[in-house]
Swiss-Prot record:
This is Outer-membrane lipoprotein LolB. Plays a critical role in the incorporation of lipoproteins in the outer membrane after they are released by the LolA protein. GO terms for biological process: lipoprotein localization to outer membrane; protein transport. Residues 1-21 form the signal peptide. A lipid is attached at residue 22 (N-palmitoyl cysteine). Belongs to the LolB family. It comes from Yersinia pseudotuberculosis serotype O:1b (strain IP 31758). Gene3D superfamilies: Lipoprotein localisation LolA/LolB/LppX (2.50.20.10). Pfam families: LolB. A lipid is attached at residue 22 (S-diacylglycerol cysteine). It is found in: Cell outer membrane. GO terms for cellular component: cell outer membrane.
Length: 207
């Protein structure tokens, strides 16, 4: 019996080592880096999406105001798009039509405004700071002009940080729609100095 006990205790450290080896996380290495071929392929697929539509829920949250709406985004070419915000009753709160060199905004009273800077116009008229030029890329899961981004284990955008004119936006991708090809974001959140923009895409139509 004593010899059996010694034999038993001698096996315990070996078993512990085997269990520890099984629980050591495997490093993914450079596979999910921005230079990986899988990301490059996914990025190229996204860049080819010249026409698409998506609709869902929009929330803008800051210390000064909270806005909840339904949204419809229609992209007809890389430089032409339409953004529609509606209230829970389905009435239009804001319609933005962007074309090269000119932007037209129609408010909930039917009054129209024209500008060459959609982001500045929305901020002046609604108080909401929305980085529209970058959002056109971010909504698809593209990093746009920033090199500061990370990928998830499926080689899709996970998080990005964008800085311009002293303003820093951090975008987190929380969920993807894998029912479309290529997979497209279904939930993302933008943060900038106390401001949050939440987008939940209920559907995508690729043309």
């Amino acid at each position: 019996m004593p010899m059996r006990k010694r034999h038993f205790y001698r096996l315990l450290p070996l078993a512990s080592l085997l269990l520890a080896a099984c629980t050591i996380p495997v490093s993914k290495g450079p596979a999910t880096s921005p230079t990986s071929p899988q990301w490059r392929q996914h990025e190229q697929q996204l860049q080819q999406l010249g026409q698409f539509e998506t609709r869902g829920a929009f929330a803008y949250l800051s210390d000064k105001q909270k806005v909840y709406a339904r949204f419809f985004w229609q992209q007809t070419s890389p430089e032409r798009y339409r953004l529609l915000l509606t209230n829970p009753l389905g009435s239009t709160e804001l319609e933005l039509v962007v074309q090269p060199g000119v932007t037209q905004l129609t408010d909930n009273q039917g009054k129209r405004y024209v500008s060459d800077d959609p982001q500045e116009m929305i901020q002046k008229l609604t108080g909401m700071s929305i980085p529209l030029e970058s959002l056109r890329q971010w909504i698809l899961g593209l990093p746009g002009d920033t090199p500061n981004f990370t990928l998830d284990d499926k080689y899709r955008l996970k998080k990005l940080t964008y800085q311009q004119n002293g303003v820093t936006w951090v975008v987190n991708y929380q969920e993807y729609n894998t029912q479309v090809t290529p997979p497209l974001p279904s939930r993302l959140e933008l943060n900038q100095d106390g401001q949050r923009i939440k987008l939940k895409m209920d559907s995508w139509t690729i043309k």
